[in-house]
């Protein structure tokens, strides 16, 4: 039987009372098998990238957990984010809790999920040294347009995108945010006016348009479903930043950011 080490023999020890919330957060970025897990006294960060076009990061504050102990300045490891997401999703019961234990470098991360009825699941996840992460060099000083909006309308727009379209073109203007697909049924455009109740603020220094692979935008579907607000930005190179805020109640929130490079129209 696997037991979880506790105390000074571990460098990271976490507990979350509602495992479903943690499972949902991991699921938002589990589009590739492995990713990097960072932890410090400031919180936890999970980063996943596809090696070329997209990088996603989850930021979780210590207050999200019922217990959060990190005994080194920074803990970093490469680990299977997808396997952890699947393991945490075993229990859909909000009364289930999870304990996490990590002894240190090259040791496995151990997880113990328990519910009020005594049901228990144990997970053991291999770790290796963290890889160097992609850096899209997103420059805040080079941002051309910023939109703060509620996610409800975008959930519906993304759900209705034409799957036969290779790309989605996004037009960033002062008056609206426009999405256009080019599929078997032809060209389809949906716009969110700046005066819409879904749009809280708009800052557009220059009106531009860029195209992105539809498959990359669809990777954000879970984040769109869970989040209540989104800050959408684009820089002068067309790198798209989507920053999602997930409200967990009682003042607790987690944040997800997707950075996506524009598609090469000549491909």
From Swiss-Prot:
DNA repair is among the record's keywords: yes
Single GO MF descriptor: damaged DNA binding
Catalysed reactions listed for this entry: Exonucleolytic cleavage in the 3'- to 5'-direction to yield nucleoside 5'-phosphates
SUPFAM superfamilies: DNA clamp
InterPro entries assigned to the protein according to its UniProt record, in alphabetical order: Cell_cycle_checkpoint_Rad1 (IPR003011), DNA_clamp_sf (IPR046938), Rad1_Rec1_Rad17 (IPR003021)
Pfam families given in the database record: Rad1
Domain of life, per lineage: Eukaryota
Location in or out of the cell: Nucleus
Effects seen without this gene: RNAi-mediated knockdown disrupts hus-1 localization to the nucleus.
UniProt GO cellular component terms: checkpoint clamp complex; nucleus
Subunit structure: Probable component of the toroidal 9-1-1 (RAD9-RAD1-HUS1) complex, composed of hpr-9, mrt-2 and hus-1. Interacts with hus-1. Might associate with hpr-9.
Family (UniProt): Belongs to the Rad1 family.
Protein name per its UniProtKB record: Cell cycle checkpoint protein RAD1 homolog mrt-2
UniProt organism field: Caenorhabditis elegans
């Amino acid at each position: 039987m696997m037991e979880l080490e506790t105390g000074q023999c571990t460098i990271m020890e976490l507990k979350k009372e509602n495992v479903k919330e943690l499972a949902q957060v991991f699921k938002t970025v589990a589009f590739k098998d492995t990713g990097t897990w960072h932890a410090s006294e400031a919180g936890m960060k999970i980063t996943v990238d596809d090696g070329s076009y997209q990088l996603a990061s989850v930021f979780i504050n210590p207050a999200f957990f019922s217990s959060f102990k990190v005994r080194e300045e920074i803990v970093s490891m490469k680990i299977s984010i997808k396997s952890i997401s699947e393991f945490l999703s075993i229990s859909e019961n909000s009364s289930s809790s999870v304990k996490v234990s990590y002894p240190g470098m090259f040791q496995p991360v151990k997880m113990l999920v328990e519910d009020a009825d005594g049901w228990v699941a144990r997970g053991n996840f291999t770790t290796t040294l963290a890889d160097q992460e992609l850096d899209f060099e997103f420059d805040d000083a080079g941002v051309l347009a910023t939109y703060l909006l509620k996610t409800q309308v975008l959930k519906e727009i993304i759900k209705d995108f034409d799957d036969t379209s290779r790309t989605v073109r996004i037009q960033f203007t002062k008056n609206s945010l426009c999405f256009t697909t080019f599929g078997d049924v032809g060209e389809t455009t949906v716009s969110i006016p700046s005066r819409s109740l879904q749009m809280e603020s708009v800052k557009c220094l220059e009106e531009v348009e860029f195209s992105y692979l539809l498959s990359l935008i669809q990777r954000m579907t879970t984040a769109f479903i869970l989040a209540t607000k989104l800050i959408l930005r684009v820089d002068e190179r067309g790198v798209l930043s989507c920053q999602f805020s997930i409200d967990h109640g009682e003042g607790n929130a987690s944040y997800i950011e997707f950075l996506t490079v524009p598609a090469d129209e000549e491909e």
